[in-house]
Amino acid sequence: MKLRSDLTINGKLYRKGESAPKWFIYPFFLFHMGMFGLSGFLMAYASDGPDLAFLYMHGGIAITVYVVFYLAIFGLDEVRWMFINAGLGLFGIWVEIDWILSLFGKSLGDFPMAVHVTPFLYYILYTFLLRQMLLDLTRSRDKPGRKRMVEMLYVLGSLAVYG
């Protein structure tokens, strides 16, 4: 993965266009965002969770920071497509989060719409990161034929999960 802007990782400066250490970036962000996303999810859907202002501050600050890193790492075009695809995939996100809530005996309809903003944004950021990791693990980012195949498998896998 080639960086879209300068980024310092563990005190080492990586310049725009240089390859980033994907074995650091993906595990770090998957774990870090997983923890923040999980805490945001649990707070949003807890029986006696925090008020909406705290939920938005907790999630909003972290989500903003993640988007800034995504822009530096993946670039504006990829991040733009993340939000376009998220807009198109809201139904899938709705189904997936509703299924997760069902594991706790709850549903999306049990909460006001405003509560869903933070968990939905975390879901979008996390699935974007998974797709980027898959493109790099399969070395298909710069190979159009392989990239189309990997993306098709990603879409089919997502549809299987939504189904």
Locations of the language-model features?
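Alpha-helical transmembrane segments of integral membrane proteins, especially early/N-terminal helices
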Residues: 12-23, 72-89
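Hydrophobic cores of alpha-helical transmembrane segments in multi-pass inner/ER membrane proteins
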Residues: 2, 33, 60-66, 119-131
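N-terminal juxtamembrane cytosolic/stromal segments of multi-pass membrane proteins
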Residues: 1-40
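C-terminal halves and exits of single transmembrane alpha-helices
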Residues: 87-131
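Membrane-helix interface and helix-disruption motif detector
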Residues: 39-59, 75-81, 100-119
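Membrane-interface helix-loop-helix junctions at boundaries between adjacent transmembrane segments
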Residues: 12-20, 50, 106-116, 133-150
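Final/C-terminal transmembrane alpha-helix of multipass membrane proteins
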Residues: 147-163
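Cytoplasmic membrane-interface regions of multi-pass membrane proteins
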Residues: 67-83, 129-147
